[in-house]
Regions:
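N-terminal small/polar loop signature for handling phosphorylated ligands or for N-terminal nucleophile
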Residues: 85-148, 244-304
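Active-site phosphate-binding/coordination module
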Residues: 123-181, 297, 308, 397
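Conserved phosphate/anionic-ligand binding catalytic regions in large, soluble enzymes, centered on
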Residues: 38-58, 142, 229-237, 241, ...
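An N-terminal, well-structured beta->alpha segment
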Residues: 2-101, 108, 196-222, 233
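Short glycine-rich or small-residue beta-strand-to-loop segments that form or flank ligand, phosphate
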Residues: 83-89, 224-227, 402, 542
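Phosphate-binding and adjacent anionic-ligand microenvironments
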Residues: 289-291, 331-529, 536-538, 547-552, ...
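Gly/Ser/Thr-enriched, mixed-charge loops and adjacent short helices
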Residues: 33-38, 42, 149-278, 283-284
Length: 567
């Protein structure tokens, strides 16, 4: 069907959401606006759905949510499943989309366990496992701006769906007509018949009680914390877990305390960026704190800023990941709770400092593709062998961490607990997290790790991103700013090429659109990959040197050379 016909069809049929028809009327005759909404269908990919809220096949709305959920329902039924758990965050229409998904699943005879109020993503993973559900859905767009929403699907293990299973769902989704293709059941009728059931508060308490068991050291110092949930889902559970372990001195940023999908004081509610901390930093001028803590809207990622004497230093995901790994291994080794053959997991784009730390404690470190599902998958592999107690920590540089086996996704609630415990422990020794990080660098070398994103909006942007990746493959660099490229790992072809000999060896990780350039022989690297959830290409750089200045100079030179390839 051509785009104009699709547009006219939506004008005629998209009447159940009062916001859609006025939007469609407002773009009449505007070819670019119509094209962007209808040039493709919002794809059910490995991260589920994510897109701008609005009218059209390329937008998040009740029709695209129903279509995706009908496909998911057919997948669940084809696998012999019969139950699902659903959670949602504070975003615009998250509650609406969650109920629409529940109606579709119930109409297909699938029992739905629905949180009655907004809830963090990790608590969806926990519910799937505890309630023995076949699948799970969380309605969220994580840290994206307020105009976005999304929909992540989970397997019975509590991990986001694997690539293989996502593709199976997509096959079913593609067979569902946009209008009238999804089965629907009245929400209240489904509640009365028990096809939709609210998840009891006892499960929320069980989650908090369970993650509290992962605390290592008792809190013995008065750690002063400023916390912001960034108008998301973290407010209640994060404060509850900190109270539970004895972190009492917590001041919450009032403007960002309550749920608000408009994110009025943080248009980009992303704990990776300084702007998300602006309100917390301002509050810290009146209420000095040792630690500033920010969780994203669905509370699966957490960022921190640490008092440095002159103000506050924001710490990166790689730095926090390295600190947590070292803290967990060192303290559990000291108190005799570290398992034999401990295992930690990180993504390939995360800091290689983790390898040095893991080696010190005879901890096996497994590298996986980007995406926390691959970390959860490794826990599942251990579980199948009865060895899940070997898992001590998993992290990715994009501020996602977990140290539990009861949740198979990144978890900002348990991580907030562990960060505060760690900060309190070191405060008792007269150290800040910045001091401890400096000690790690003295021991293992300076690791300058950076991540840079380049945005390519719309249909033209998608094509540009494909062309950039194709050009990099067709014209592999022999050197980057004077540093020899010693190996190229193309996860698209699953081949590693030794650039000196031309010898190729297979890569055992799954296929992915990632190019990994090994520079020199000291562990330096540059990695290029398109984002799986946003219209961006990301460049990850690791530069290792004996001083921060030298590492930064190398990193900047490599970044500039790759930026030139994007123009």
């Amino acid at each position: 069907m051509d785009i104009q016909k699709l547009y006219n069809q939506w004008l005629e049929k998209a009447t159940e959401d009062a916001d859609l028809i006025p939007e469609l009327e407002s773009i009449k005759g505007k070819e670019d606006e119509i094209f962007d909404r209808f040039y493709r269908e919002l794809e059910f990919g490995t991260a589920g759905l994510r897109g701008v809220i609005g009218a059209g096949t390329n937008r998040m709305n009740v029709y695209t949510v129903r279509k995706a959920t009908q496909g998911l329902a057919r997948y669940v039924l084809s696998a012999g499943g019969n139950s699902a758990a659903i959670a949602y965050d504070s975003r615009i229409k998250s509650d609406v989309f969650a109920k629409e998904a529940a109606r579709v699943l119930a109409a297909n005879g699938i029992t739905v366990h629905l949180y009655k109020e907004l809830m963090p993503t990790p608590m969806l993973s926990f519910a799937v496992r505890k309630l023995h559900c076949t699948t799970g859905i969380v309605v969220t767009a994580s840290h994206n701006p307020s105009k976005y929403n999304g929909y992540k699907a989970y397997g019975s293990d509590g991990c986001q769906l694997s690539v293989e299973n996502s593709e199976k769902v997509l096959e079913f989704v593609d067979t569902v007509p946009m209008f009238g293709g999804a089965k629907l059941m009245d929400f209240d009728a489904a509640l009365e018949q028990g096809l939709i059931q609210y998840i009891p508060d006892s499960l929320i308490q069980e989650y908090l009680d369970t993650i509290a068991t992962y605390a290592i050291e008792p809190i013995k110092t008065d750690l002063k914390v400023i916390y912001t949930p960034l108008n998301g889902t973290g407010n209640k559970p994060v404060r509850a877990i900190l109270e539970k372990i004895g972190v009492k001195n917590v001041t919450v940023v009032k403007e960002q305390e309550l749920p608000d999908g408009n994110f009025p004081t943080a248009p980009y509610p992303n704990p990776e960026i300084r702007q998300a901390f602006e309100c917390a930093l301002k509050l810290a001028e009146e209420v000095p704190a040792d630690l500033l803590l920010a969780t994203d809207p669905d509370a699966d990622r957490v960022g921190i800023a640490v008092a440095d004497g002159d103000g506050y230093t924001l710490m990166s995901g790689n730095e926090v990941g390295a600190l947590l790994l070292d803290y967990i291994l060192s303290r559990r080794a000291a108190n005799g709770t570290l398992p034999q053959n401990p295992l930690a997991v990180k993504t390939i784009v995360s800091t290689q400092l983790a390898a040095k730390i893991a080696a010190k404690y005879n901890c096996q470190l497994v590298d996986v593709l980007t995406g926390f599902k691959y970390i959860g998958e490794q826990v599942g592999i251990l579980e199948a062998k009865g060895e899940e107690n070997r898992f001590v920590f998993g992290f990715e540089e994009s501020y996602g961490y977990n140290m539990s086996t009861c949740v198979r996704d990144k978890d900002a609630v348990i991580t907030s607990m562990m960060i505060c415990e760690m900060a309190a422990y070191y405060k008792g020794m007269g150290k800040s997290l910045l001091t401890v990080l400096a000690d790690l660098y003295k021991e293992h070398g300076i690791f300058c790790c950076s991540q840079n994103s380049f945005t390519f909006e719309g249909a033209a942007g998608m094509e540009t991103m494909k062309n950039i990746m194709a050009s990099l493959r067709a014209n592999p660099p022999k050197e980057v700013a004077g540093e020899t490229v010693t190996a190229i790992l193309d996860f698209g072809t699953r081949l590693e090429t030794n650039t000196a000999t031309g010898q190729q060896t297979p890569i055992t990780l799954p296929k992915s659109d990632v190019l990994y350039y090994r520079l020199g022989d000291d562990g330096d690297n540059v990695i290029v990959r398109p984002s799986g959830t946003e219209p961006k290409i990301k460049i990850y750089i690791t530069a290792i040197a004996e001083s921060e200045e030298k590492a930064k100079a190398k990193s900047d030179a490599w970044l500039n050379e790759f930026k030139a390839k994007f123009n």
